[in-house]
């Protein structure tokens, strides 16, 4: 069974390219363009991992991630930040709300696959749920 990956990205082209890359390497892709859609998709689809853009139009990626981590239905899902830049301040904020790591755009399909496999390992998920 293909792992479900949720892409939260407000830029249509970035969202589509990332979706194509992930589909091509064997993942089932779910897409959201803002915070509200991200939360609804995460609750309904229960993805194995979320790639979260940090600059969303309604609520930024850090706050959206915090909402997902506070929600019992989605708190166990690993979140990886996707961003064109990451300052030390943003890195600290992201870490505080439970974002596992960040990837700088553009990102290769190999990096995507390695990140997904690293953060969707079953033993890691169980350890993080405790």
Feature annotation, model-predicted:
Residues 9:
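Conserved acidic carboxylate
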């Amino acid at each position: 069974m293909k792992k479900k990956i949720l892409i939260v990205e407000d830029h249509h082209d970035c969202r589509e390219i990332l979706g194509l890359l992930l589909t091509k390497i064997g993942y089932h892709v779910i897409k959201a363009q803002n915070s509200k859609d991200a939360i609804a998709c995460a609750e309904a689809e229960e993805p194995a991992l979320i790639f979260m853009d940090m600059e969303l139009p309604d609520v930024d990626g850090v706050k959206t991630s915090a909402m997902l981590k506070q929600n019992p239905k989605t708190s166990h899902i690993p979140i990886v930040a996707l961003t064109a830049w990451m300052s030390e301040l943003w890195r600290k904020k992201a870490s505080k709300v439970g974002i596992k790591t960040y990837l700088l755009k553009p990102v290769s399909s190999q990096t995507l696959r390695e990140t997904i496999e690293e953060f969707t390992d079953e033993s890691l998920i169980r350890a993080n749920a405790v």
